């Protein structure tokens, strides 16, 4: 939209003269009447209709929050509460482990989802003797809170409450490859102190780019001694395996009440009702699934999901989340090795009747369904899982090894890192390599983490494709150090989703859309600089589609530059024809492609950015251009950011420190946006 201020050439004195001549007595009466009516309307008007705000990330909350977690703690005799902000389940898992630890010190703990409680109740926590609030807070995206911690974050920002007497500790979960490392954990720790709460142990900062599990164990083994010293308590014994859930086998149950993979409401896949979100995904039909690349070494694919009649709305730059299923071959092998009938209908019921979490996953269900849709069986299990399963190893040496890997000793940590993490051993591989380890399948299901949704940058614009969401992904497959071939859960599952389906059946994908801040500028005339090697090009396909659509509507569109990178032009140049067409029509002003393996010396996107430094600086400094980076966070995003800093320093010209500050200010102003992963 252009500016609405128009210079008519009328002077101030002329305007005053006109006003004097125009305002007669009649005009004044009418003017007074209008003012009176407006005043009446503002005072007595009804509440205006609510306007949906699409820029805010929508979250799924409980319909009624518990009135007081403090009252619940009093009622159940607990004095430690561990809140978790979790997007992938890891922070929730850590919170459960900490709450379970409490019994060793004569204390009782509970893990809690902040979305289910009123956190203003924190001020009442000192009413409980030796009370402690622990916060396991993950940072999502570019310094954002997780969905379930959004309300808590908003409350902290606005809170004007005295938390004197509240004792707390924070462990943050983040990734150092991201610009805002552990922003949420750091903010919660600092803000609670500002509100008067007392920190009883140092902030822990876990790094998922390194070894998050080891970071947590190291913090945890120092945290509990600090708790003991502060409250004057002592450990009552060694860590023990205490079951949280009891197994109930259903021998004669109506199949109509058995979960078959639904994430929330029973039979929700048979009777779909909006709104659709993480707890109520939409079953989208796969209408297109085509290979994008020519090479045989990797499989890069483009999928289109039909969202007609779902009322799902998305914008360019949003993410689509899909719930995958584990490979049936792995599930069958687990059943075989444990000698279990996977089709037994069962429930795992929480032994703590006061807990808000009645089951670890939707129950009643079958072991087959749980291992296929609800449990993560492909990632290396964490140390607490190894510790609890060790008791079922009949061979002493195997039991000793498992307990050692679960210990906090240097030797144990090193063994766990090399034998489990670096070798990418999942639970089936561990059972295969330790023949005497045969845990009951119900205990295994209790300890395994939940299978999480996978997020992809949407590769389409809703202006052009309002009834479909497009995905661009590369199938993950690699050989481990132990010689096994591991496959990506979601990408392998998506690859098999043929549009026609088997026997004419439709291929369905449970999905929902997560709003993002990765947005095109409000003004279409603003130049955009997009950098996206590999599948990082995905959101930019949507951006370019939208700008092409705006041009077709007769709108003026600013320069649109894409810096794309791949290995070879004849191997993995994604969307080659589409990009060429956009470039030919002028929707894509400049298309610069770096081929890393097509010549003796490797060429990456940052080399092309340096080549165009003068033009880029003009667009950024004079044209107010917005910069977008999508792809690998560990190397590419960092190198590209350094390249922009070099360009700013050289073209400014200015000192390097000033250039770094210049780029960071672009980020603060929303002119340098990242959609990256590690």
UniProtKB/Swiss-Prot annotation:
User: What processes in GO biological process is this protein linked to?
Assistant: nitric oxide biosynthetic process; response to hormone
Q: Which Gene3D superfamilies match?
A: 3.40.50.360, NADPH-cytochrome p450 Reductase, Chain A, domain 3, Nucleotide-binding domain of ferredoxin-NADP reductase (FNR) module, Translation factors
User: What are the alphabetically sorted keywords of the record?
Assistant: Acetylation, Endoplasmic reticulum, FAD, Flavoprotein, FMN, Membrane, NADP, Oxidoreductase, Phosphoprotein, Transmembrane, Transmembrane helix
Q: Where are the transmembrane segments?
A: 23-43
Residues where FMN binds: 86-91, 138-141, 173-182, 208
PROSITE patterns noted in UniProt: FAD_FR, FLAVODOXIN_LIKE
Which InterPro entries does the record match to this protein?
CysJ-like_FAD-binding (IPR003097), FAD-bd_FR_type (IPR017927), Flavdoxin-like (IPR001094), Flavodoxin/NO_synth (IPR008254), Flavoprot_Pyr_Nucl_cyt_Rdtase (IPR001709), Flavoprotein-like_sf (IPR029039), FNR_nucleotide-bd (IPR039261), NADPH_Cyt_P450_Rdtase_alpha (IPR023173)
- Could you tell me what reaction this enzyme catalyses? 2 oxidized [cytochrome P450] + NADPH = 2 reduced [cytochrome P450] + NADP(+) + H(+)
Tell me the residue numbers annotated for binding NADP(+). Answer: 298, 535, 596-597, 602-606, 639
Q: Which parts of the chain does the record assign to the membrane side Lumenal?
A: 2-22
Record's GO cellular component terms: cytosol; endoplasmic reticulum membrane
In this chain the Flavodoxin-like domain maps to 80-224
Tell me, in one coarse class, where this protein mainly resides: endoplasmic reticulum
Give the record's membrane topology.
Single-pass membrane protein
**Domain (FAD-binding FR-type): residue spans on this chain:** 279-521
Q: Where, by residue number, does FAD bind? A: 424, 454-457, 472-474, 478, 488-491, 677
Cofactors that this protein relies on: FAD; FMN
Keyword check for NADP: yes
Which EC number(s) are documented for this chain? 1.6.2.4
SUPFAM superfamilies per the record? Ferredoxin reductase-like, C-terminal NADP-linked domain (SSF52343), Flavoproteins (SSF52218), Riboflavin synthase domain-like (SSF63380)
Cofactor annotation remark: Binds 1 FAD per monomer. Binds 1 FMN per monomer.
Q: What class of enzyme is it?
A: oxidoreductase
The UniProt entry's sequence similarity note says:
Belongs to the NADPH--cytochrome P450 reductase family.
Q: What is this protein called?
A: NADPH--cytochrome P450 reductase
Lineage from the top down?
Answer: Eukaryota, Metazoa, Chordata, Craniata, Vertebrata
Query: Quick one: which gene encodes this?
Result: POR
